[in-house]
A protein has these predicted regions:
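Conserved SAM-binding loop
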Residues: 132
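Class I SAM-dependent methyltransferase "Motif I" SAM/SAH-binding loop
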Residues: 100-104
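N-terminal mitochondrial targeting presequence
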Residues: 1-33
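Class I S-adenosyl-L-methionine
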Residues: 209-214, 218-263
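Conserved beta-strand signature within the Rossmann-like core of class I S-adenosyl-L-methionine
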Residues: 196-202
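S-adenosyl-L-methionine
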Residues: 33-95, 105-112
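Conserved SAM-binding strand-loop segment of SAM-dependent methyltransferases
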Residues: 138-146
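Conserved SAM/SAH-binding beta-strand->alpha-helix loop
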Residues: 125
Length: 263
């Protein structure tokens, strides 16, 4: 409405437009555009189905060995892990895993933030990784299936200091719980492999509340009971670690962080 009104005014000559330059009309149009963008990105919050989360976690913990045994490691993931292992062993530095790194922007940012650490970004999508993003000498980008990668990490002698899981696919429909990491059969592998700290960010607070509940239940069942949850809390100044985080910040969509820390 505001944009079309501005177009109509432009046909009446510059004098009628002059009072609005940089003023209320432009500000209102910008505000409306921001509201539209926020409505596109925002996912409605809802109450966590505690019983459903607990039931799934109990099943996955009880059947985890069966899940691992019936699933062969993907060949490309085995090769990628070999590369990761050699890279990590060549450096005497704390190891950080950027799980689901997408185009590698977050891996680059983390490598710059932690120059004395080794940062390995892992994503399943060759298309995203093929963007050709350059990373510093302390970083590496690899294509691999995360479930298999975590399994190989757990079977290796590598020690992970911290894992970042930034803006994973939320699969927002209620029936999609099994597709979210907290409801997936690979959850025990993730918790075992994440190291001393797991940092998760999302624009959907419900996702993080659900993950916190799942991790707590897994801890009760003996899967990383040493991990203590902090959050989720809203980030006051998100730094744009990923393209999603940058989009959300521009659209005025709040983003949240959950930290699981070894204590």
């Amino acid at each position: 409405m505001l944009i079309s009104m501005a177009r109509r005014c432009s046909t009446l000559g510059p004098r009628l437009l002059r009072p609005y330059r940089g003023g209320a009309l432009r500000a209102a149009a910008l505000h409306a555009a921001t509201d539209d963008a926020a409505s596109i990105y925002a996912i409605p919050e809802r109450d966590v189905d505690e019983a459903a989360v607990h039931q799934l976690v109990e099943r996955h913990v009880a059947q985890h060995a069966t899940y691992l045994n019936k699933r062969p490691i993907a060949k490309h993931t085995a090769a990628a892990f070999q590369t990761a292992s050699e890279f990590a062993r060549s450096r005497t530095a704390p190891l950080i895993i950027d799980a689901g790194c997408g185009t590698g922007r977050s891996t680059l940012k983390l490598a710059e933030r932690y120059p004395d650490s080794t940062v390995i970004g892992v994503d399943r999508s060759e298309a995203r990784l093929s963007k050709g993003r350059r990373v510093p000498a302390n970083a590496l980008l690899l294509r691999a299936e995360l479930g298999d990668f975590w399994r190989l990490l757990n079977d290796s002698e590598l020690t992970v200091e911290e894992t970042f899981l930034l803006y994973p696919n939320p699969y927002p429909k209620t029936k999609m719980l099994k597709q979210r990491f907290q409801g997936h059969a690979s959850l025990p592998s993730l918790l075992h492999a994440c190291g001393r700290r797991l940092t998760i960010r999302a624009s959907w607070r419900t996702y993080l509340e659900e993950f916190r509940l799942a991790a707590s239940k897994a801890g009760e069942l003996g899967i990383r009971p040493d991990l203590v949850s902090k959050g989720p809390y809203e980030l006051s100044e998100p730094e744009g670690l990923t393209l999603f985080e940058r989009k959300y910040a521009k659209a005025g969509v709040p983003v949240y962080e959950l930290v699981l820390k070894c204590e």
